[in-house]
C-alpha cells in the first residue's frame, strides 16, 4: 500500500499521476486555493452552501499547514473559525483581455464568470479561453490517464518538486472531475464547492448560478481502507480515517501537549486554554466552544427531540443519547475493563471505572482541595460552596445544583420508574438503583476493604466504610460546626436547623424530613405487614423491624458501648446512649433554651409550651402528649401486664418499666451526676437532678408563669389551676391531687 501520509501522495490518486508544468514551479499559498466571493454573490448562497464552503476552506488550509506550505493565518480562516461570515469585497480589476489575467488574483472568480449578472461572453472568446486555460487538455490528460506501474509512479515522485503552484487554470470542470474524481481536494479548491463554468467547444452559452455550482456532486467512493473496507470519496478523508487504526495524532497542543488526529479538534481544544467561546445562544447568552454544542444546547429552549427510540418511543435531543439508550434494550456493553473484566454500555462510565483501578482524580476543588475523577463532579461539588442551585422544579419550586439530582426529583412527581428488574419485576426510577438491586439476587460483593477485608456490593458503600478507618469527616455544618462523614448526612442534618420537610404523604398530607421516613409511613396506609415473627406471630412492615424484634426472643445485643461496656439490641440505642458520656445535646428549644440529645425528645418537650396532646384514648377520651403515654394508659383498660419480674412476680405493662423495676432488686444505678457523683436508676431522674446544680427551671406554667426544675412538679402544680384530682379512694370515693395525699388518707380507713 502506498504511503498516504506523505505530502506527495496527494498527487497520486486512483492511478493518475499529476506531472508538474511550468506554471507549477512557484510555491503554493492559501490564495491559490481559496475561492473569493463578493457580497452579492455570498448573499445568494443558502446556509447549506455556506457551510460547505466553510468546511472545505478550513480543510484546505489545514492541509497546507500540515505540509508546511502556510505559516500565517489569513483573516478569512479566523472569521470561519469564529463562526462569522466572511464578506469579501468584489475585486475592481477589469476582466476581458488576456493581460487582465496576469494582474487579477488567480483564485478570484467574478460575477461575469459565474453568470450572476446574466450576461453571456462571446462564444469565440469563451472557446479560445477554455482551450487555453483548460488544464485537462488532450496532452495533459494523456499524461494523467496513464495508469503507470509502481516504478513509473515512483519515478514521477522523484521528479516532482516539493513546492508546486496550483492556479485557477488547474481546476477541472465538473465533466472532467467525473473522469478524474480522485484528484486530491486537500491541495485544490473543492470540486464540490465551486467549479469552473462548464463550457465545451460545442456549447455556445451556459447560464449557471452560484447555487447550482455549489450543489454537492455525488461522486464515486474509490478511496478504500485496507483495514476495515470503508470507502471514501476523497483520499484526504481516507488519510484521516486511517488514523483511527494507526492511532496517529499529528496535531499537538502547545499548552498541554495533548494530541489530536484532526486539526479541527485541536482548534476546538485550544479554546479551552484561551476561554474563547465564539458560539453564543440567542436565548440565554451562554457561550460554547463548538457549533454542534450550541445546536444541542438550543434544543433545551425549543424542546426539540429529533432522535426517537424505535423500541419504546422515547425521544432524545442528542443522537449519542439515543445510541446509549438503545443499549438498554439490546443489552450491549461494548466497553470492557482489562483489569477486572467488567463491561459497560457507555464509554464515559468505562473511563470513570478505570479511574478506580488507577486512583486518578485529576480535578481538584480550590476551596477544600477535594479531588474528583470527573470535571462534572467537580462542578457540582463547587456549588456546595457557592450555594448555587440552577435547576428548579416547576412542580414544587425546589431547586437543585445538578441536572441528575433534578431529574431524579422530577420522577417523584411523575411516578416514572422506567428500569425494571427481570428477576422480580421491581421497578426503579434510576438505572443505578436497578444495578444495585440486581446484586441482591446475585449476592455479588466485588468491593473489598483493604483494612478489614469486609466486602460490599457497591463502590460507594466501600468509600463510606473506609471513613470509619480514617475518621474522615469532610462535611461540616455552617450553623453549628458539626462534621459528618457523608454529604447526605450533612444534608439531612441541615433540616434540623431549617425545619425543612420536603417529603409529603399524598394520602394524609403528613410531611417528613427524610424519604425513608415517608416510605415507612406510607405503609401504615396500606397496612402491608409482610414480615412475620415465627416465635410470636407478630408482623412487621419492614424486614429490618422484624430482625430487631427477633432480638427480644434471642436476647442478642450486638451493639456495645466502648466507654462503659453496656450492650444494646439496636444501633440507634447505642448512639443515644453515647450522648450520656459526651454530654452532647444538639437539639435546643427556642422557647426556654433547654437542650436534648434526641430530636424526638425536643418535639415532645415543645408540647409542654404549646399544651398539645395529640394522642387520645378511644375508650375514655383522655389525651396525652406522648404516644408511649397513651399506650401505657390503654393497658389500664385491658389490664394487660405481660412483663413479669422473676424476683417478686410483679407484672408490668412495658418492658422498660420491668427493666427499671429490676434495678430495685439489683441496686443498679447506672446514671451518675458529674457534679456530685450521685447515682440514679433512671436517666430522667439524673436529668432532673442536674437542674439543681445549674438552677435551671425549664418548665413554665402557662397560667401563672411559675417555673419548675422538674416536669413532675409542673404537672402537680397545674392541678391547682385545673382543680384536677386524679387519685381517688376506692373506699369512700374522695379524690386527691397527689398520690402521696391518697396514701396518707387510705391509712385512716380501718384495715389499711
Swiss-Prot record:
Record key words, sorted: DNA-binding, Isopeptide bond, Metal-binding, Nucleus, Phosphoprotein, Repeat, Transcription, Transcription regulation, Ubl conjugation, Zinc, Zinc-finger
Domain of life of the organism encoding this protein: Eukaryota
Chain residue numbers at which the record places covalent cross-link Glycyl lysine isopeptide (Lys-Gly) (interchain with G-Cter in SUMO2): 207
SMART domains according to UniProt: KRAB, ZnF_BED, ZnF_C2H2
KRAB domain mapped to chain residues: 28-99
Location(s), subcellular: Nucleus
Zinc finger boundaries on the chain: C2H2-type: 223-245, 251-273, 279-301, 307-329, 335-357, 363-385, 391-413, 419-441, 447-469, 475-497, 503-525, 531-553, 559-581, 587-609, 615-637, 643-665, 671-693, 699-721, 727-749
A GO biological-process term: regulation of transcription by RNA polymerase II
InterPro entries: KRAB, KRAB_dom_sf, Krueppel_C2H2_ZnFinger, Znf_C2H2_sf, Znf_C2H2_type
An example Gene Ontology CC term for this record: nucleus
Modified residues (Phosphoserine): 117, 122, 200
Coiled-coil blocks: none
Pfam families: KRAB, zf-C2H2, zf-H2C2_2
A GO molecular function held by the record: RNA polymerase II cis-regulatory region sequence-specific DNA binding
Function noted in UniProt: May be involved in transcriptional regulation.
PANTHER family linked: IP01015P-RELATED
Family listed: Belongs to the krueppel C2H2-type zinc-finger protein family.
Protein's name according to its UniProt entry: Zinc finger protein 184
Source species of the chain: Bos taurus (Bovine)
Amino acid at each position: 500500500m502506498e504511503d498516504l501520509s506523505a505530502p506527495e501522495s496527494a498527487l497520486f490518486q486512483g492511478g493518475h499521476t499529476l506531472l508538474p508544468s511550468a506554471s507549477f514551479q512557484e510555491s503554493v499559498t492559501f490564495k491559490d486555493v481559496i475561492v473569493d466571493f463578493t457580497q452579492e454573490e455570498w448573499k445568494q448562497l443558502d446556509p447549506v452552501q455556506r457551510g460547505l464552503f466553510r468546511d472545505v476552506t478550513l480543510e484546505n488550509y489545514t492541509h497546507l499547514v500540515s505540509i508546511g506550505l502556510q505559516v500565517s493565518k489569513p483573516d478569512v480562516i479566523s472569521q470561519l473559525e469564529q463562526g462569522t461570515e466572511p464578506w469579501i469585497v468584489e475585486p475592481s480589476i477589469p476582466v476581458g483581455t488576456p493581460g487582465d489575467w496576469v494582474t487579477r488574483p488567480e483564485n478570484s472568480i467574478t460575477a461575469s464568470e459565474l453568470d450572476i449578472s446574466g450576461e453571456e461572453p462571446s462564444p469565440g472568446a469563451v472557446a479560445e479561453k477554455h482551450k487555453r486555460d483548460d488544464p485537462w487538455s488532450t496532452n495533459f490528460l494523456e499524461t494523467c490517464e496513464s495508469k503507470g506501474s509502481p516504478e513509473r509512479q515512483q519515478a514521477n515522485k522523484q521528479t516532482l518538486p516539493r513546492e508546486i503552484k496550483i492556479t485557477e487554470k488547474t481546476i477541472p470542470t465538473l465533466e472532467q472531475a467525473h473522469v478524474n474524481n480522485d484528484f486530491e481536494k486537500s491541495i485544490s479548491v473543492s470540486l464540490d464547492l465551486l467549479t469552473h463554468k462548464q463550457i465545451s467547444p460545442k456549447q455556445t452559452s451556459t447560464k449557471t448560478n452560484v447555487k447550482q455550482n455549489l450543489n454537492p456532486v455525488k461522486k464515486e467512493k474509490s478511496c478504500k481502507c485496507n483495514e476495515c473496507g470503508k470507502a471514501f470519496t476523497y483520499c484526504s478523508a481516507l488519510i484521516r480515517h486511517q488514523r483511527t487504526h494507526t492511532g496517529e495524532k499529528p496535531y499537538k497542543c502547545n499548552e498541554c501537549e495533548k494530541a489530536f488526529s484532526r486539526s479541527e479538534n485541536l482548534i476546538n481544544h485550544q479554546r479551552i486554554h484561551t476561554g474563547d467561546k465564539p458560539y453564543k445562544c440567542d436565548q440565554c447568552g451562554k457561550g460554547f466552544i463548538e457549533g454542534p454544542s450550541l445546536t444541542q444546547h438550543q434544543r433545551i429552549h425549543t424542546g426539540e427531540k429529533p432522535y426517537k427510540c424505535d423500541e419504546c418511543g422515547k425521544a432524545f435531543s442528542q443522537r449519542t443519547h439515543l445510541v446509549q439508550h438503545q443499549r438498554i434494550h439490546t443489552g450491549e456493553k461494548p466497553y470492557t475493563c482489562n483489569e477486572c473484566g467488567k463491561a459497560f454500555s457507555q464509554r464515559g462510565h468505562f473511563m470513570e471505572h478505570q479511574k478506580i483501578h488507577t486512583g486518578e482524580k485529576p480535578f481538584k476543588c480550590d476551596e477544600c482541595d477535594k479531588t474528583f475523577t470527573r470535571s462534572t463532579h467537580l462542578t457540582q461539588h463547587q456549588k456546595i460552596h457557592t450555594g448555587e442551585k440552577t435547576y428548579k422544579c416547576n412542580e414544587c419550586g425546589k431547586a437543585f445544583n445538578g441536572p441528575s439530582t433534578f431529574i431524579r426529583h422530577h420522577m417523584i412527581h411523575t411516578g416514572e420508574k422506567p428500569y425494571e428488574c427481570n428477576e422480580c419485576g421491581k421497578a426503579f426510577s434510576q438505572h443505578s438503583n436497578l444495578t444495585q438491586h440486581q446484586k441482591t439476587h446475585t449476592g455479588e460483593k466485588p468491593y473489598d476493604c483493604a483494612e478489614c477485608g469486609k466486602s460490599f456490593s457497591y463502590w460507594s458503600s466501600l468509600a463510606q466504610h473506609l471513613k470509619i478507618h480514617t475518621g474522615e469527616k469532610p462535611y461540616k455544618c455552617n450553623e453549628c460546626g458539626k462534621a459528618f462523614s457523608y454529604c447526605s448526612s450533612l444534608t439531612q442534618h441541615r433540616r434540623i436547623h431549617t425545619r425543612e420537610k420536603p417529603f409529603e404523604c399524598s394520602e394524609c398530607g403528613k410531611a417528613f424530613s427524610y424519604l425513608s421516613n415517608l416510605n415507612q409511613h406510607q405503609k401504615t396506609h396500606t397496612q402491608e405487614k409482610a414480615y412475620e415473627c415465627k416465635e410470636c406471630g407478630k408482623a412487621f412492615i419492614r424486614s429490618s423491624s422484624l430482625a430487631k424484634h427477633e432480638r427480644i426472643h434471642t436476647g442478642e445485643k450486638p451493639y456495645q458501648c466502648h466507654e462503659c461496656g453496656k450492650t444494646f439490641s439496636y444501633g440507634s440505642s447505642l448512639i443515644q446512649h453515647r450522648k450520656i458520656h459526651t454530654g452532647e445535646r444538639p437539639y435546643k428549644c427556642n422557647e426556654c433554651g433547654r437542650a436534648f440529645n434526641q430530636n424526638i425528645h425536643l418535639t415532645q418537650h415543645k408540647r409542654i409550651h404549646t399544651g398539645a396532646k395529640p394522642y387520645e384514648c378511644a375508650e375514655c377520651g383522655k389525651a396525652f402528649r406522648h404516644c408511649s403515654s397513651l399506650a401505657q394508659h390503654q393497658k389500664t383498660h385491658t389490664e394487660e401486664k405481660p412483663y413479669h419480674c422473676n424476683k417478686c412476680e410483679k407484672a408490668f405493662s412495658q418492658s422498660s418499666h420491668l427493666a427499671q423495676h429490676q434495678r430495685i432488686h439489683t441496686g443498679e444505678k447506672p446514671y451518675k451526676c458529674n457534679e456530685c457523683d450521685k447515682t440514679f436508676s433512671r436517666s430522667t431522674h439524673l436529668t432532673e437532678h442536674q437542674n439543681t446544680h445549674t438552677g435551671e427551671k425549664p418548665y413554665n406554667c402557662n397560667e401563672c408563669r411559675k417555673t419548675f426544675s422538674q416536669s413532675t412538679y409542673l404537672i402537680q402544680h397545674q392541678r391547682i389551676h385545673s382543680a384536677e384530682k386524679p387519685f381517688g379512694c376506692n373506699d369512700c370515693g374522695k379524690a386527691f391531687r397527689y398520690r402521696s395525699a391518697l396514701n396518707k388518707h387510705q391509712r385512716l380507713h380501718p384495715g389499711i
